[in-house]
């Protein structure tokens, strides 16, 4: 829980005293002053663990702490008139990922800071280009609710509102501000690029209403008719000149079935933002060009525009594009949208990452600005660990076990309590003893990881919470019965002392060990692996010492955070 502070102090001063760590903790969390006595053994244990880390691990932990103290906390401020109503408006063609988290959190945080409302609006009026995933209608609200830890004040689905859009399109036609264009795409493009009106621009209102009625009845095929807003034919951007606001769609919508006419994105956005009372549109800077078209629509209706605030992208090296994820799923390279190698919110939830950690990272470290920012997973992990560590039991895990045989076993067994004729060691599950203990039998043959066994040849090791051992030599041991025997390489060792201070003074590596093990499967960011853990683990979220935090899922352990 406090390893980041310890690593920072170790790099800065070399030696770390518990009092120095406590000073840093109390400065940030004054309420812990009354619990100093409880903190000291926890900190002492974590100092021991950091002392055994290699320099790169220590630097990584220290960097996470440095970033939290270098960046002064700056709250997000926005211009406010009366009330604040914001919205997060995803397209359901895929599921939400860490990049969407910036939009969700900023919109929600700002709304709640100013006692306003936060609306989730699912934008699904482009079924040809962005075909909706039917399951997204259930999973997107679930993801949003998970991240903000409450239900949105309102959930709106645009495909439920087609009649509303039709009403306002007809209103513009009746006011002579919109018309039905029957030009082929290339014909209109030629008029537009020359700044000339197409032949349909000056049709009478009656003619346009009749054509509009035919569009709604499905009498036109795709591309034969669109509704255009009258804008500025001399506008410097040809794409703004009489841009379309509604078009024919022939394919059935996955959610509502066949509807001949759908509004285009910018029109539906303006109608909804106005009718829902959106006061602040907080969106990615890539939508700047849309603002020009939306402004023309607002002016056509005589409506006041909301306040626009823009932010940059939240980038990651993991796949986020919907088409890329779909391809990986089809190729069976990943299991689905919740594969933990993805940065989707459903995958992060599967890993057991706390939504509060992501939320705090967005508010404190990402913020509302136009800079594109690469996701700092270590910071998200840090915010997660400061919440979860104090309630997470610790266990041993070995990735590649090798047996060690204790030569002087008979000389040491009287140091342990005996249960059913077998000596055992009672080890706390956490520096906070309230989380309980587990009892591990002490046998003549124990197991350590092969990477630690190689170090044993160079200098003594300390088995965590047990004793110090030295290398004697390589041997072979036999497994099996009289019918089937297997020989296996092992290391003969001797117990040289039980003194932990001796290990610290002489810098013996402190390593994990197992008296027996249970083979399990790990699902990590680079795929599936085998590992060996203590048997009879009851909890579903644990900290495997030196390996990270893992969440149980059926018969395997899912990687959570390092």
From Swiss-Prot:
The record's annotation in PROSITE patterns points to:
AA_TRNA_LIGASE_I
Cross-referenced InterPro entries: aa-tRNA-synth_I_CS, Gln/Glu-tRNA_Ligase, Glu-tRNA-synth_arc/euk, Glu/Gln-tRNA-synth, Glu/Gln-tRNA-synth_Ib_cat-dom, Glu/Gln-tRNA-synth_Ib_codon-bd, Rbsml_bL25/Gln-tRNA_synth_N, Ribosomal_bL25/Gln-tRNA_synth
Cellular location(s): Cytoplasm
Task: Please report, in chain numbering, the residue ranges of the motif 'HIGH' region.
Answer: 90-100
Report the Pfam families cross-referenced here: tRNA-synt_1c, tRNA-synt_1c_C
What catalytic reaction does the record list? tRNA(Glu) + L-glutamate + ATP = L-glutamyl-tRNA(Glu) + AMP + diphosphate
As recorded in UniProt, its EC number(s) are: 6.1.1.17
Q: Which of UniProt's keywords are assigned here?
A: Aminoacyl-tRNA synthetase, ATP-binding, Cytoplasm, Ligase, Nucleotide-binding, Protein biosynthesis
EC class name:
ligase
**Is-annotated flag, keyword Phosphoprotein?**
no
The Gene Ontology CC terms held by the record are: cytosol; protein-containing complex
GO molecular function terms listed in the Swiss-Prot or TrEMBL record: ATP binding; glutamate-tRNA ligase activity
Name the Gene Ontology biological process terms: amide biosynthetic process; glutamyl-tRNA aminoacylation
* Reported function: Catalyzes the attachment of glutamate to tRNA(Glu) in a two-step reaction: glutamate is first activated by ATP to form Glu-AMP and then transferred to the acceptor end of tRNA(Glu).
Q: Which family does it belong to?
A: Belongs to the class-I aminoacyl-tRNA synthetase family. Glutamate--tRNA ligase type 2 subfamily.
Protein name according to UniProt = Glutamate--tRNA ligase
**Species whose genome carries this gene:** Nanoarchaeum equitans (strain Kin4-M)
The gene from which this protein is expressed is gltX
């Amino acid at each position: 829980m406090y390893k980041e502070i310890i690593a920072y102090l170790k790099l800065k001063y070399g030696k770390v005293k518990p009092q120095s760590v406590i000073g840093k903790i109390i400065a940030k969390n004054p309420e812990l002053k009354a619990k100093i006595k409880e903190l000291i053994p926890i900190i002492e244990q974590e100092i021991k663990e950091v002392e055994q880390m290699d320099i790169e691990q220590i630097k990584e932990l220290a960097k996470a702490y440095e970033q939290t103290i270098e960046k002064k906390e700056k709250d997000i401020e926005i211009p406010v008139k009366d009330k604040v109503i914001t919205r997060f408006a995803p397209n359901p063609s895929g599921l939400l990922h860490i990049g969407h988290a910036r939009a969700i959190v900023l919109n929600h945080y700002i709304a709640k800071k100013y006692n306003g409302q936060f609306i989730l609006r699912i934008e699904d009026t482009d079924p040809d280009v962005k075909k909706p995933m039917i399951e997204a209608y259930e999973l997107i609200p679930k993801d949003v609710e998970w991240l903000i830890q409450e239900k949105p004040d309102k959930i709106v689905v645009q495909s439920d509102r087609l009649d509303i859009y039709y009403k306002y399109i007809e209103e513009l036609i009746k006011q002579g501000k919109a018309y039905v264009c029957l030009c082929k795409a290339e014909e209109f493009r030629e008029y537009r690029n020359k700044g000339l009106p197409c032949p349909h621009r000056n049709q009478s209102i009656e003619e346009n209403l009749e054509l509009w009625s035919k569009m709604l009845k499905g009498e036109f095929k795709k591309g034969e008719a669109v509704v255009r807003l009258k804008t500025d034919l001399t506008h410097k951007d040809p794409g703004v000149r009489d841009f379309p606001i509604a078009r024919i769609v022939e394919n059935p919508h996955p959610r509502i079935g066949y509807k001949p006419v759908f509004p285009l994105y910018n029109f539906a956005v303006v109608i909804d933002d106005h009718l829902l009372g959106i006061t602040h549109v907080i969106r990615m800077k890539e939508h700047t060009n849309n603002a020009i078209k939306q402004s023309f629509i607002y002016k056509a209706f005589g409506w006041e525009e909301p306040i626009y605030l823009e932010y940059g992208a939240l980038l990651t090296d993991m796949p986020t594009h919907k088409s890329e994820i779909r391809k990986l799923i089809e190729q069976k390279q990943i299991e689905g949208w919740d594969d933990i190698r993805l940065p989707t919110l459903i995958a992060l939830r599967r890993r057991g990452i706390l939504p509060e950690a992501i939320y705090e990272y967005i508010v404190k470290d990402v913020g509302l600005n136009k800079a594109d920012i690469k996701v700092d997973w270590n910071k998200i992990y840090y915010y997660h660990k400061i919440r979860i560590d104090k309630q997470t039991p610790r266990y041993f895990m070995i990735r590649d076990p090798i047996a060690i045989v204790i030569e002087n076993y008979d000389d040491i067994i009287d140091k342990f309590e005996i249960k059913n004729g077998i000596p055992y060691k009672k080890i706390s599950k956490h520096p906070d003893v309230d989380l309980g203990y587990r009892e591990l039998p002490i046998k003549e043959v124990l197991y350590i990881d092969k990477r630690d066994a190689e170090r044993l040849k160079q200098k003594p090791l300390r088995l965590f919470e047990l004793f110090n051992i030295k290398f004697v030599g390589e041997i072979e041991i036999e497994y099996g019965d009289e019918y089937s025997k297997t020989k296996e390489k092992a290391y003969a060792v001797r117990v040289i002392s039980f003194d932990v201070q001796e290990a610290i003074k002489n810098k013996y590596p402190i390593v994990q060990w197992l008296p027996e093990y249970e083979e399990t499967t790990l699902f990590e960011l680079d795929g599936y692996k085998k590992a060996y853990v203590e048997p009879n683990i009851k909890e579903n979220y644990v900290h495997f010492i030196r390996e990270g935090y893992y969440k149980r899922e059926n018969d395997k352990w899912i990687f959570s955070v390092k």
